[in-house]
Regions:
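Short coil/turn segments at secondary-structure boundaries
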Residues: 143-147, 183, 223-225, 278-280, ...
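GT-A fold catalytic core of metal-dependent nucleotide-sugar glycosyltransferases
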Residues: 188-277, 281-282
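Solvent-exposed, acidic/flexible segments
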Residues: 160, 189-192, 258, 296-297, ...
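N-terminal anchoring/stem segment of glycosyltransferases
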Residues: 14-205
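Active-site-proximal beta-strand/loop segments in catalytic clefts of secreted hydrolases
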Residues: 134-137, 181-184, 212-214, 243-246, ...
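Loop/turn elements at helix/coil->beta-strand transitions in domains of secreted/extracellular proteins
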Residues: 126-129, 174-177, 205-208, 214, ...
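Catalytic core and acceptor-binding pocket of nucleotide-sugar-dependent glycosyltransferases
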Residues: 21, 26-27, 197, 267-398
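N-terminal Lys/Arg-rich, disordered targeting/topogenic segments
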Residues: 1-19
Length: 398
């Protein structure tokens, strides 16, 4: 019995050893097959001699040689300096809305009509108007900006540059002056406080100063400022015109009135206007409580609405522009913002959208202009050969 038991155990031990050996051999074979398959697949999908990855280039630097040629400029320096503004003015001239035409319909079909007794500005103001961009952050070393020497790259254009371009183009179309001002930082205030100081100085040389934030853009390049001034009832006695802010809880002053937004300001020169802007600039130093707005949002905007507008409160001193006309934009709240910025789109939370608005406004105008030119020459440019049979002979394309 013992012998039989040992024999039986020996047989079982032998069977187990054979089984383990077979399992081990199977594992080795499986691993080899896996490695061979992995190598085959990896070399087929990821060849060893891969082409080198494309070298990432700086688009601005690469295209810096593509500056407009200066050797084709006219010999008359004065003429060449004014060539582009004159060209843009002539190009847009057939599209510009007449100043005395009371009705304007936007591209979205919105109808605006000026009351007959508000048609005051009937002639172009030209160089009496200056559009000003004021900023403390301007740097001529920063690429893709107005001050940088290399040509702009539109696909990567920053929002701030898009705003500056929009203002400059609008000024050239309508014959206004334009200035881009790099202001010094206030040592004891937020950077936006420089706007009243620069505007006050510009009012010494121009009758009207239009101050805009870089994220506020003109949506209709064909609509003159004079027409908008008529719509907003700007009179010869008006000191400034600004748009209401949005009807949100934080946008009311201490007296319960909706504050005005300083992202778009029309200022008219007069001694009283100088006094207003001086008081505005001095507000944190001379008015108790105004220093609260040195760094607290909305800075100079809150100071004006909480204090200055109540000092200059004659009937026409401060014109309140409807928020929907010159504040807000079409992007906020998924396009459902109460203020759509119909004439001046202020993109405070969508600053990156200004290049899109710039491109849209330019291409809309150019497409209409080119289309009109085609129809003007349609007898020479269009041939109706639909009644011809093939092979065609004698069509006479000249």
């Amino acid at each position: 019995m013992i012998s039989n038991c040992l024999d039986s155990r020996g047989e079982r031990r032998g069977i187990l050893q054979v089984s383990r050996r077979a399992t081990w051999i199977w594992s080795i074979c499986s691993l080899c097959v896996f490695l061979i398959l992995f190598y085959t697949l990896s070399t087929s999908y990821f060849p060893q001699n891969q082409p080198p990855k494309p070298h990432t280039t700086n688009i601005i630097t690469t295209n810096c040689h593509k500056k407009p040629r200066t050797d084709v400029a006219q010999n008359d320096t004065k003429t060449s300096d004014t060539a582009l503004p004159m060209l843009l003015a002539e190009l847009w001239k057939p599209l510009v809305h007449p100043l005395t035409e009371r009705v304007f319909i936007t591209d979205k079909g919105e109808r605006f009509e000026i009351p007959a007794d508000q048609i005051r500005w009937k002639s172009p103001l030209g160089k009496r108007v200056v559009i000003i961009d004021t900023d403390t952050r301007l740097d001529d070393k920063k690429e893709n900006t107005m001050l940088h020497d290399c040509p702009l790259d539109i696909p990567s254009l920053p929002g701030r540059t898009g705003g500056h371009l929009n203002h400059y183009i609008y000024a050239m179309i309508h014959g206004y002056d334009y200035r881009l001002v790099r202001a010094a930082d206030y040592p004891d205030r937020h950077g936006t406080w420089v706007k009243p100081a620069i505007t006050k100085e510009a009012l010494k040389t121009h009758d009207f100063v239009i101050s805009l934030d870089s994220d506020a853009v003109f949506t209709h390049l064909d609509l003159p400022l004079e027409w908008l001034m008529n719509l907003w009832d700007v009179t010869p006695e008006t000191l400034v015109a600004m748009a209401y802010d949005l009807d949100w809880k934080g946008d009311y002053d201490s007296r319960g009135n909706l504050i005005l937004n300083t992202g778009f300001v029309i200022a008219q020169a007069s001694q009283r206007t100088q006094d207003m802007f001086q008081r505005w600039e001095d507000c944190p130093r001379s008015t108790p409580g105004c220093e609260h707005w040195n760094f607290k949002w909305a800075h100079e905007q809150s100071a004006f609405s909480h204090y200055i507008r109540y000092e200059f409160n004659r009937t026409h001193d401060v014109k309140n522009i409807p928020c929907n006309h010159a504040n807000g934009n079409e992007y906020s709240l998924n396009g459902n913002c109460e203020c759509q910025g119909v004439f001046v789109s202020h993109n405070w939370k969508s600053k990156h959208k200004t290049p899109e608005l710039l491109s849209r406004s330019i291409m809309t105008s150019l497409a209409r202009r080119v289309h009109a030119q085609f129809h003007n020459d349609i007898k020479d440019l269009y041939i109706d050969a639909s009644s011809q049979t093939y092979p065609i002979e004698g069509l006479g394309i000249q």
